[in-house]
């Protein structure tokens, strides 16, 4: 699962926040992952590796590339049996057409239903509800920003996905972000791009 503090799945939140030692490999501490923590996660009980350095508690060791660290750790645990088994996530599906207002969960259900009928499509999500909704969508290629300061990312990112891959993307974008960059859709006609844009 994905840790999102009190906004995430309770069992994931409990696992992370009650851990005696967190291993954070390539994790960028931001408002979308640790900003809604109910408990304070302290560097004293974490080993963090990113940006070419490793921090253990309050100590920092530079010039340790993440790829080299992971390769060395994999080599040291080779042949050991994992103590815990993961479980397959259950993504919401089966959208019911009714008179109730549309919620982000309904959007995730609709996209998951579409994927089951037509196959997976790449996904570009903006920040906020769009990003959190994307976490309830079946695993597919996803581009999304990590900070609220990147509002407006979704539409241009979706166009970039189609330009780079030739595949039709789904874009999840909020109404404010759409006002900022939605006009970029005017560039779709000459190259023949056809993203599906869902405005929250």
Task: List PLM regions with ranges.
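Solvent-exposed alpha-helices and their adjacent loops that cap or buttress functional pockets
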Residues: 13-18, 38-41, 113-117, 136, ...
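Glycine-rich, acidic loop regions that bind phosphate or pyrophosphate groups
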Residues: 1-87
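Structural motif
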Residues: 21, 122, 168-170
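Thiamine diphosphate
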Residues: 1, 57, 67-70, 132-200
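A short acidic, amphipathic alpha-helical/loop segment
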Residues: 34-37, 110, 184-187
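Active-site glycine- and acidic-residue-rich loops that bind
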Residues: 27, 101-106, 177-180
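Short beta-strand segments
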Residues: 24-26, 50, 126, 172-173, ...
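Active-site diphosphate/adenylate-binding microenvironment
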Residues: 86-166
């Amino acid at each position: 699962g994905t840790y999102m503090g009190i906004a995430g799945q309770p069992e994931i939140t409990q696992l992370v926040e009650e851990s005696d030692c967190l291993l954070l490999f390539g994790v960028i501490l931001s408002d979308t992952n640790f900003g809604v923590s109910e408990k304070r996660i302290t560097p004293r009980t974490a080993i963090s590796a990113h940006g070419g350095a490793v921090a253990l508690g309050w100590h920092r060791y530079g010039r340790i590339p993440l790829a080299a660290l992971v390769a060395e750790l994999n080599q040291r645990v080779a042949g050991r049996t994992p103590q815990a088994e993961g479980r397959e996530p259950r993504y919401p599906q089966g959208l019911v057409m009714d008179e109730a207002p549309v919620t982000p969960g309904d959007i995730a259900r609709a996209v998951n239903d579409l994927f089951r009928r037509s196959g997976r499509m790449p996904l570009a999500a903006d920040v906020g509800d769009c990003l959190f909704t994307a976490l309830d969508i079946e695993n597919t290629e996803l581009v999304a920003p990590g900070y609220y300061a990147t509002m407006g990312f979704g539409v241009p990112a979706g166009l970039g996905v189609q330009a780079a891959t030739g595949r039709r993307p789904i874009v999840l974008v909020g109404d404010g972000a759409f006002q900022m960059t939605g006009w970029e859709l005017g560039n779709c006609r000459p190259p023949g791009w056809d993203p599906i844009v869902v405005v929250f």
